[in-house]
């Protein structure tokens, strides 16, 4: 059984599915049969992601966080409908209702107004959008390969942990830090004085993403405790279990206030921030973090004391500097690819606005 977490735009993953007994599967399949060419749309939590069921995906059923849409192929192309629904995401998010987790109803989906040109015109629109989407996908693959290159070079230079094949000095994170603090627990304020850096601004792969930031007002007396500066390591302490421990380096000079679900780590001369961040983002560390976090009310947590108690190796600083130089070069390549990706995404957005309004 798949959930909304398995549905991305034009892509379905089989990560962490829920398995059912044969009798439960029969009952669920009777309620909603999923067929090739159907559209799957997320309607709870992250709303409006839409993908098409491929031919090779058989025998699945869905949680109620996903709507199944069966297009009439005689009057509408399923990929045309997919793009049009994706273009409605902002509208659907505004229409969502709920307290703990917002969602939209199937009736709301069925009553959406859509543009319905002749089928041949739909195919032409799909052809254009597919071409741009393919280029976007290629850019994302390039970024993923560059991320994997950083990880591969990290292991090549330092080895895995706790295996520690090069027999580096072993310590704890508390041995390589000078200051560890939580961010502010104050709520975001529209039009606030300072930009507010939250857990969503740290990506799973360890990047700082400031495309969606909030603002906050905070007394001057509290600024030193919860603002970030260049070289700070930022650790996401509270999130879903698989996302706890997202870590990045703050590499800007802009004054920003840090939110409470993120820990600010200032390091000493024994380790470079890029090395500590890369260490915590390695697959072997992510497995360790999942194993040590505590879960309550749907959220997992690793506190500052637990973070500082994590074991790590401490390679020679000269070797760390070599890694930082290498990573900086790869980051420059990533920046070029990222800029191209953003231009393509803007183009796709403009085209969808032109086609669908």
Regions found by a protein language model. Give the residues of each.
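Short amphipathic alpha-helical signal-transduction/dimerization elements
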Residues: 85, 89, 93, 281-284, ...
């Amino acid at each position: 059984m798949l959930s909304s977490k398995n549905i991305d735009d034009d892509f379905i993953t089989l990560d962490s599915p829920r398995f059912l007994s044969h009798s439960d599967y029969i009952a669920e399949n009777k309620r909603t049969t999923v067929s090739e060419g159907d559209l799957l749309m997320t309607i709870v939590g992250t709303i409006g992601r839409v993908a098409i069921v491929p031919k090779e995906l058989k025998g699945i059923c869905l949680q109620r966080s996903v709507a199944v849409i069966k297009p009439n192929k005689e009057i509408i192309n399923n990929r045309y409908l997919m793009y049009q629904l994706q273009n409605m995401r902002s509208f659907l998010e505004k229409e969502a209702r709920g307290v703990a987790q917002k969602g939209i109803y199937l009736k709301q989906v069925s009553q959406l107004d859509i543009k319905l040109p002749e089928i041949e015109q739909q195919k032409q629109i799909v052809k254009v959008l597919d071409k741009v989407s393919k280029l976007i996908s290629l850019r994302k693959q390039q970024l993923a390969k560059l991320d994997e290159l950083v990880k591969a070079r990290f292991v090549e230079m330092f080895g895995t942990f706790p295996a520690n094949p090069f027999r580096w000095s072993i310590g704890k994170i508390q041995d390589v830090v000078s200051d560890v603090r939580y961010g502010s627990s104050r709520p975001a304020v529209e039009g606030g004085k300072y930009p507010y850096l939250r857990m969503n601004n740290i990506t799973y792969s360890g990047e700082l993403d400031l495309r969606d930031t909030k603002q906050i007002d905070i007394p001057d007396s509290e600024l030193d405790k919860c603002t970030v500066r260049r070289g700070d390591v930022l650790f996401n302490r509270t999130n879903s279990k698989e996302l706890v421990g997202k870590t990045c380096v703050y590499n800007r000079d802009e004054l920003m206030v840090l939110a409470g679900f993120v820990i600010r780590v200032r390091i000493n001369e024994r380790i470079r921030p890029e090395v500590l961040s890369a260490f915590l983002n390695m697959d072997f560390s992510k497995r360790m973090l999942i194993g040590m976090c505590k879960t309550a009310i749907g959220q997992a947590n690793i506190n500052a004391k637990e973070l500082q108690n994590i074991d790590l190796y401490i390679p020679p600083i000269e070797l760390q500097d070599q890694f930082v130089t290498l990573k900086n070069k790869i980051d420059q390549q990533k920046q070029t690819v990222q800029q191209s990706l953003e231009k393509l995404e803007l183009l796709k957005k403009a085209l969808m606005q032109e086609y669908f309004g």
